[in-house]
């Protein structure tokens, strides 16, 4: 790759993305839709070649998710979160599974596939993870019950790695990834990731108690998070044949550091440096992921699949999410119905679906022969990759626009009594 051209592309992504994000902030809307559209414009003008976009996602996707999951869990307040922990668990397990299945069924129905085809279920898995972080600026300007806000934010932090786990299982079932036993695979990915995350947090605490990193604490923290991710995704599978979710491990590590080590006086300054560094880095990553997702979509692809993709998006947003949340939160102890409805209507998709869709699209387009013949007979590999990419793009942009628009009016209607007394 020509290094001069590569740096030129980066300048367009960062400078252009920053301007777009600033415009979004100025007019009071989430930056995701505008960043996606900016990427789409770059695609139309062929500013950045498709092969550069596609080859970038493997690195940017994995590296970006490590940073975003770490900082998201690092900033979670356990004292508030534990008051709604039962709701978070219901949303992150039962609701996520229901959203996955229903979104997949809708996709299969729209594209005339067998109702339980793994192709649709792969789409459902990709869009099952939420990203209410896009609503934080809106929540900050609202008189909203902090328990509702923390529920949505914590749900996202922990269903992000679970969404990745479910996607990996679907890829395994499709023959696009290796798995000996899907049930055991889920257990080793999710539970193994949690255990490894706690070990990582404890190990980090021991190291920084013995060595004063001072100005180098932030790169050490990032390096150790990546090291544990690598152990989970690379070393452990080569030894045992089973994977641990490195993303889950990173999220739990961040939660431990942000709620245990942060409160220790001797580490307070170091943790402030870590928070600032990760926050700044996450801005770069968000810009890259959303602009590159938009840039990966060609106009012919969008024209061909826009309408069915829009229907898939509506099915996931207005059917799968509400049904999943209302069923999951019907398990006692039951929260007020108005609060449950609000949670059901606020689950915008974001970074994780964007990254997963782009990575799946890139892998299939590079190696179409990896798609098994029984799957390719239902939908050709290039069409499979294209439909999932465009449907995910549409789900992200529609969910963010709709749910950011109605977040405040719905809160005034559904949560009025609770917020007025809090």
Curated annotation (Swiss-Prot):
Protein name: Probable Na(+)/H(+) antiporter 2
Subcellular location as annotated: Cell membrane
GO molecular function, one term: potassium:proton antiporter activity
Annotated InterPro entries: Cation/H_exchanger_TM, Na+/solute_symporter_sf
GO term, biological process aspect, one: intracellular potassium ion homeostasis
Gene Ontology cellular-component annotations: plasma membrane
Similarity remark: Belongs to the monovalent cation:proton antiporter 1 (CPA1) transporter (TC 2.A.36) family.
Listed transmembrane segments: 3-23, 28-48, 52-72, 93-113, 119-139, 157-177, 183-203, 216-236, 242-262, 281-301, 307-327, 341-361, 384-404
């Amino acid at each position: 790759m020509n290094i001069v051209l590569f740096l030129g592309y980066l300048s367009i992504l960062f400078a252009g993305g920053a301007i777009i994000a600033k415009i979004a902030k100025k007019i009071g809307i989430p930056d995701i839709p505008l960043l996606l559209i900016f990427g789409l414009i770059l695609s139309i003008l062929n500013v950045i070649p498709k092969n550069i976009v596609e080859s970038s996602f493997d690195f940017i996707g994995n590296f970006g998710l490590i940073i975003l999951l770490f900082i998201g869990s690092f900033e979670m307040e356990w004292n508030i979160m534990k008051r709604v922990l039962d709701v978070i668990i219901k949303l992150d397990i039962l609701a996520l599974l229901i959203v996955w299945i229903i979104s997949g069924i809708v996709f299969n129905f729209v594209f005339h596939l067998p109702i339980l085809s793994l192709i649709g279920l792969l789409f459902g898995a990709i869009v099952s993870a939420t990203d209410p972080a896009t609503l934080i600026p809106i929540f900050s300007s609202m008189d909203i019950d902090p328990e509702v806000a923390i529920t949505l934010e914590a749900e996202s932090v922990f269903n992000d790695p679970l969404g990745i786990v479910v996607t990996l299982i679907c890829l395994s079932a499709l023959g696009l990834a290796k798995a000996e036993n899907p049930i055991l695979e889920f257990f080793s990915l999710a539970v193994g990731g949690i255990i490894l995350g706690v070990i990582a947090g404890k190990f980090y605490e021991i190291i920084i108690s013995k060595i004063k990193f001072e100005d180098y604490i932030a790169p050490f923290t990032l390096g150790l998070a990546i090291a544990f991710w690598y152990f989970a995704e690379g070393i452990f599978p080569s030894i045992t044949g089973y994977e641990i979710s490195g993303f889950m491990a990173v999220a739990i590590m961040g939660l431990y550091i942000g709620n245990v080590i942060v409160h220790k006086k001797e580490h307070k300054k170091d943790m402030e440096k870590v928070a600032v560094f990760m926050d700044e880095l996450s801005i770069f990553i968000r810009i890259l992921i959303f602009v590159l997702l938009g840039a990966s979509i060609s106009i012919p692809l969008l024209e061909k699949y826009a309408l069915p993709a829009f229907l898939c998006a509506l099915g996931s947003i207005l059917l799968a999410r509400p049904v999943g949340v209302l069923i999951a939160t019907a398990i006692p102890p039951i929260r007020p119905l108005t609060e449950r409805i609000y949670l059901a209507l606020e689950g915008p998709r974001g970074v994780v679906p964007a990254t997963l869709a782009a990575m799946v699209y890139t892998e299939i387009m590079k190696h179409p022969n990896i798609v098994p013949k029984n799957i390719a007979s239902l939908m050709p590999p290039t069409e499979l990759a294209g439909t999932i990419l465009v449907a995910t793009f549409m789900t992200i942009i529609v969910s963010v626009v709709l749910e950011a628009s109605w977040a405040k009016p719905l809160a005034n209607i559904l949560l009025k009594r609770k917020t007025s007394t809090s």
